[in-house]
Amino acid sequence: ASRIPTVEAQFFGELATLLAWADEVARLEVMANADTPHDAARARAYGAMGIGLCRTERMFNDSRRLPIVQDMILADTPDERRAALEKLLPIQRADFKGIFQAMAGLPVTVRLLDPPMHEFLPTASQLEFEIGQLRNLQRAARSVAELPETLKLLDPELPRDYVESLGKLQASLALYRESRSADAALERREALLRKVHVLSEVNPMLGHRGVRLGLSFPEIYEMQIRAILEAAAECTKEGIVVHPEI
C-alpha cells in the first residue's frame, strides 16, 4: 500500500494565539508525562505547565544503561549493588538536570523506581533459548577441533587442501576459545536466568515493587534522590529556578 509523506506537527501562530486566550481564563493547569529531557522540552513547547509524572524506570530502559541496571539486580551484596548504582548516578543526574532546564520555573514530579526488578530482565524463555544457542556454539567449536582426527577415520591420507583449510579454521577457533567470550556470555545468561526465577511473582502488579522495593534496597532510592538534589543544585547555581517534587 502507498504511504502519504508525513511532517512533524507544529504550532502555528493562529493556534498559539487561540491557546493564549484560553490560558487567560483557564482555571486548570495541564501538566505532562515526560521521562527524558527531549520529552520535557516538547511538553514545554506545547504549553505544559510542568511535569505531573516523570517515571524514572523509563530512564533505566535505555539500551546503554540496561546492562548496568542488570548488574545492580545481579548484585549479591549492598556493596556490589552500590558499585553499579555509582555508575548510574551521573547518568540519572544528567537526565534530571536536562528535565529541570526544560521546565525552568515549573514543577517536576519525579516518581522513584516503581516496577519490580524482573521487568528489567529478559524473559525466562528468551534466556533459555540464548543459553541453548551458546551451548550449541561451544559444542560446535569442540567438534571442529576434533574434526581432522575424525576425518582420518574415513581417509588416513587426507588431501592437503583439507588439512590447510581445517588448520586455518582451527586457528580461528583457538583464538575464540582463548577469549572466553562465549563462556562469559553463557555465565551471564545463566546468572540472569537464576535471578529471573528468584524474582518471579504470581501477581507482579501487587508484588515486590514501589515502596516495598525501596525498603528492601534503600540504596536505589538513595542514589535517585541524590541525583535529583545534585541536578537541582547545579541548575540553581546556573540561575535556573527548579521545583522538584518527589
Walk through the language-model features, giving the residues of each.
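Conserved alpha/beta-domain cores
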Residues: 8-246
